[in-house]
Structure formats: structure tokens, C-alpha cells
């Protein structure tokens, strides 16, 4: 391929995904693979790497640094699970995308007087669930950091809200807890309220970045 220049980044600021591409390399998890990577850098005269990614990418960046390659790590993950930073590239995009979907599900949940369980991504971190839950006014938010949630309390909340005249109920469930479909069946059986589970999935990893994501990314690039 040809060498990149500044013009290659023109008109990309509002695009989702990555113009560089992304992939996993199982070989790089081994010491031999890491040494091979460092040798390739030296062979091609690469005197520094900028690594954008999450936990796995940071482990790889650390390995390259230990092997003498100048390395800079930029936190890029929707999960917001990188230590020593309050923000990761992609998080706000994922939250905004998820919230738009949640609002649509809430509309139909309200129309049909249902309980909706919406599962969002985040691996073992509950930040997307927390932000989406607060931002959409969910009645309950389930986080892996607080895994000892009481399902009976969820059931009681739904029943009590019905008694107060609230006709629909929104539960945001983090990927780290999961099992949304089976949870919906148990809640419906216990409450008599029609309950549906929606797993948003990979749609959260795409979309045009909102302002906050653009600002943080530009700042990180500087």
C-alpha cells in the first residue's frame, strides 16, 4: 500500500468505523509473535507506534514498548473499561446510538403496556447500561459491578408501579449480566405483565460520532 498523508483523513470526521481497518492477531498474544512484530517495525524503519484500542490493544502496546518500540496508546473502546482515563474513544457514540434505540423500544412498550428489558453492550463493565439507564429514565438498571441484584425486587417494582398507574416498565440490562430473554420469561410469569427482551448488539459499535466523541478524539490526536 501507499504511504498515508494528511489528505487521506479529509472528510472522515463524521464517518463511523475506521479508515485504517481493525483486526485481531492471535499470534501477537505469544512472545514469539510480539518479537516478530517489533522486528517488522525495525525492518521498515518504524520508530513509533500509535495504538488505538481497548484492553487487548493496550496489552499489545505494552509488549511493543518493552521490546524497545516507542509506543503511544489512545483509549478506543465503547466499554469505557480502560484504567487511568475518564473517557474512551467510541463510548459516547455507543451511548447515543443505544439511547436512540431504547427510546424507540420505549414507545412501543408504552403503547402495548409492556415491561421491556433492553440489553446493552459493555463486556464486564456497566458504563453503557448506567449512562443509558439514567439518560432514558429507566425504572431499573442492572450492572455487573452490582451483580447481587434481587430479581424479586425487580418483580415487586413492576407490580408496585402498576398499582400506582404506570403502564410500562423499562429495565436496562448490562451485557455483563446478560440472560435477558430468560429473565423476561421469569418476570412475565411472576407479574402477569407482558415482558419482552431486546438485545441491541453490534449496532452500538457503528454510527456517526456525536460532538463529545469528536472533541475528545481531536484532543487525543493533538
Region spans (language model):
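Catalytic, metal-anchored helix/loop core of enzyme active sites in primary metabolism
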Residues: 188-193, 200-218
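Short, ordered loop/turn segments at secondary-structure junctions
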Residues: 24-25, 54-57, 69, 74-80, ...
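Accessory alpha-helical/coil subdomains and C-terminal extensions
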Residues: 51-53, 63, 91-194, 198
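Conserved small/polar residues in nucleotide/adenosyl-binding loops
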Residues: 1-8, 216-222
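Glycine-rich oxoanion-binding loops at beta->alpha junctions
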Residues: 2, 7-51, 89-96, 100
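Acidic/polar active-site rim loop that often engages polyanionic ligands
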Residues: 74-87, 110-111
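Short beta-strand elements at the ligand-binding edges of bilobed clamshell
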Residues: 84-95, 207-215
Amino acid at each position: 500500500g501507499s504511504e498515508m498523508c494528511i489528505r487521506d483523513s479529509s472528510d472522515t470526521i463524521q464517518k463511523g468505523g475506521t479508515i485504517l481497518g481493525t483486526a485481531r492477531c492471535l499470534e501477537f498474544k505469544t512472545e514469539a509473535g510480539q518479537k516478530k512484530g517489533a522486528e517488522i517495525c525495525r525492518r521498515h524503519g518504524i520508530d513509533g507506534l500509535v495504538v488505538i484500542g481497548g484492553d487487548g490493544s493496550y496489552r499489545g502496546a505494552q509488549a511493543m514498548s518493552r521490546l524497545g518500540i516507542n509506543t503511544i496508546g489512545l483509549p478506543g473502546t465503547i466499554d469505557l473499561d480502560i484504567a487511568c482515563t475518564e473517557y474512551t474513544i467510541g463510548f459516547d457514540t455507543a451511548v447515543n446510538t443505544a439511547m436512540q434505540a431504547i427510546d424507540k423500544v420505549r414507545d412501543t412498550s408504552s403503547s402495548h403496556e409492556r415491561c421491556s428489558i433492553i440489553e446493552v453492550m459493555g463486556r464486564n463493565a456497566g458504563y453503557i447500561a448506567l449512562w443509558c439507564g439514567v439518560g432514558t429514565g429507566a425504572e431499573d438498571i442492572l450492572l455487573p459491578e452490582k451483580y447481587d441484584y434481587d430479581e424479586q425486587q425487580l418483580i415487586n417494582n413492576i407490580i408496585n408501579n402498576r398499582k400506582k398507574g404506570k403502564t410500562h416498565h423499562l429495565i436496562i440490562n448490562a451485557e455483563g449480566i446478560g440472560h435477558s430473554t430468560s429473565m423476561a420469561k421469569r418476570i412475565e410469569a411472576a407479574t402477569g405483565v407482558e415482558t419482552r427482551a431486546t438485545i441491541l448488539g453490534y449496532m452500538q459499535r457503528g454510527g456517526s460520532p456525536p460532538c463529545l466523541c469528536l472533541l475528545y478524539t481531536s484532543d487525543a490526536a493533538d
